[in-house]
Amino acid sequence: PNPEAAETLALAIKLADKKNADLILATDPDCDRLGIGVRQKGKIKLLTGNEVGILLTDYLLSEKKRLGKLPSKPFIIKTIVTTDLIYEIAKDYNAKVYDVLTGFKFIGEKLGVIEKQNELDNFILAFEESYGYMAGAYVRDKDGVVAAMLVAEMAQHYLCQQKTLIDRLEEIYECYGYNANLLKSIEFKGMQGIKEMNEKIEAIRNNSPAALGKYEIKQFKDYQKGIEGLPSSNVFADHASVPALANDSSLVSPRTR
């Protein structure tokens, strides 16, 4: 079961309604990714990976500061296709944000480099928009167990203030600016699908559009060229005048059936 898919949580939502539960926590079978649902105005609302990552970043930084446990040089790690709102939150805590390529192996690699610099104690959180989170360097991969514990703790923290996680998310948006996240998955089947996908990506790469709908493309980043100190990867990003849009072939996975 994929915790990103709403239909996966249908039974959990039904049980939550029966028990009037405030929170749903759901992992995939190997318990590395976490999906959550929050009761808001009587109904369960599912949160995206970006929304949960925003909440965790805000909660961990603010609580560590309140308790006097925020390290001197805190840092967050995220992937290049994950929300940039993290930068705005991090500024308030003098925290650094590292961007890496899509996939937790790159997050693990970055932690390894930082560990050699004796800076690992400054690590706060790593996450990607595809529902993977890691807090603490105990496991160098996305960890649904630790994420579930933190989300439950965070939810209880705000419920004690008569707030839901969605209420807190709205407060964050009011403070740092509203963000909308839309993920569109396109399935390409088999070897022919791989070929078709690569052809479409190359067509856009070789003839990048000047606009996306009514929005002018201000910047086109081609990560295949190994930009921003990152390894070469078949990813490009269109930075438009209003939205920021990312295209990642690893998020459009061919499935052989």
For the regions a language model picked out, list residue spans one by one.
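Short gly/pro/ser/thr-enriched loop/turn and capping motifs at secondary-structure boundaries
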Residues: 33, 53-55, 104-108
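Short Gly/Thr/Asp-enriched flexible loops that form oxyanion-binding sites at enzyme active sites
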Residues: 32-51, 86
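Catalytic or ion-translocation cores adjacent to nucleophile or general acid/base/metal-coordination motifs
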Residues: 48-61
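N-terminal small/polar loop signature for handling phosphorylated ligands or for N-terminal nucleophile
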Residues: 1-33
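Anionic group-transfer/hydrolysis microenvironments
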Residues: 28-30, 37, 130
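Phosphate-binding and adjacent anionic-ligand microenvironments
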Residues: 17, 21-23, 43, 63-257
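Well-ordered alpha-helical segments embedded in enzymatic catalytic cores
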Residues: 7-11, 56, 106
